[in-house]
């Protein structure tokens, strides 16, 4: 991937517009998890240290496009950014007509999704954004898979377009994990539905040595292996597809192992007692809510032997401690492994936080959908735009 990097450009005295991914959880007007904001700090500080006037933009939530709604305002993000940077970050509501921040200052534009045409990558809006800056920096890996005005269109018309520190680091890490991995390559894909990750599973089954599936996804594979899943979440219409994926992985010399034991409950509830069962002993009224201890041990062995680990999604309902042991044990196995490890996806990040292993994962991706699309082998529109502006 050839693209301009922010670090290659003289930013002194320049108006620098940075697209970040500040789509963070907010409650009662306060940011409840600032991981994505912290991840952007090196890029912002680099621009400030280089003598730029810094303008930041992001989306937050899913407001009705073209309409201001206070619940989706970027104000809580501006407040948290001010605290983290140790300097004022001014929230600017009306900026399309022009914004002229002073060198050394930071402004945060109001939610880009309040602008009509943002999601459709409207050319007029993209040109308005481009006119605000001398240098456009795309730093939001989490939205790199969307061709929108603030992530794609603006970069086509800005005088200079480049990748920020975070985006460049993301792309370098993902390239290392998937394009030239140290073997064995082990991928962990969790989540509730095969349907939402079918392309990822298909793509990974072609390249990995072991593809560990967890969550509701695993239930469909358990069913495909001929076992009962009781009243667990699974997709009947994708059982044949799961079987095909297992056979395809085997044909390539890899495997998609099926759990040998699981942790079940009768209801999906925080107070529900957990019971370990062999995968052959699932009752009609059981719900599979985690992988069992023997399965965890086997999967941890795969991870221990790995040269590269890609982790996307928990393997159980880790929000409930009694159904979180599988995710905890695999997380610790990754943390203790000598492999190059990359993890991504919202639930994965929450699990990493819960078990306190962030500093022992080689690289934590800030992307959810973008991380998945990269795993699928798709070209991300924002990256394609940066490559086209590399000259």
Swiss-Prot record:
GO terms for cellular component: cytosol. It is an enzyme of class 2 (transferase). InterPro entries: Phosphoglycerate_kinase (IPR001576), Phosphoglycerate_kinase_CS (IPR015911), Phosphoglycerate_kinase_N (IPR015824), Phosphoglycerate_kinase_sf (IPR036043). Its EC number is 2.7.2.3. One of its GO terms (molecular function) is ATP binding. The keyword Transmembrane does not apply. Pathway: Carbohydrate degradation; glycolysis; pyruvate from D-glyceraldehyde 3-phosphate: step 2/5. Belongs to the phosphoglycerate kinase family. Monomer. This is Phosphoglycerate kinase.
